[in-house]
């Protein structure tokens, strides 16, 4: 099982994804750069955790859209 993310990681990730949905992809490296540009996050660890959470959300949305299209 994976780790549970703190609320501040989820809320920041959700806010960034809502404000800039076209800036994020299913690539962690690209999302990491986008988070660094869009948000003022002082620590690398928090930036990476937010980018990882956003990557997971984008992948989940794509899989859900693919499943709905197949059904």
Curated annotation (Swiss-Prot):
CC per GO annotation: cytosol; ribonucleoprotein complex; ribosome
Listed SUPFAM superfamilies: Rps17e-like
Presence of the UniProt keyword Chloroplast in the record: no
One Pfam family per UniProt: Ribosomal_S17e
Listed InterPro entries: Ribosomal_eS17 (IPR001210), Ribosomal_eS17_CS (IPR018273), Ribosomal_eS17_sf (IPR036401)
S-S bonds: none
Alphabetical GO biological process terms: translation
Entry-linked NCBIfam families: PRK01151.1
Family: Belongs to the eukaryotic ribosomal protein eS17 family.
PANTHER family: 40S RIBOSOMAL PROTEIN S17
Protein name from the UniProt record: Small ribosomal subunit protein eS17
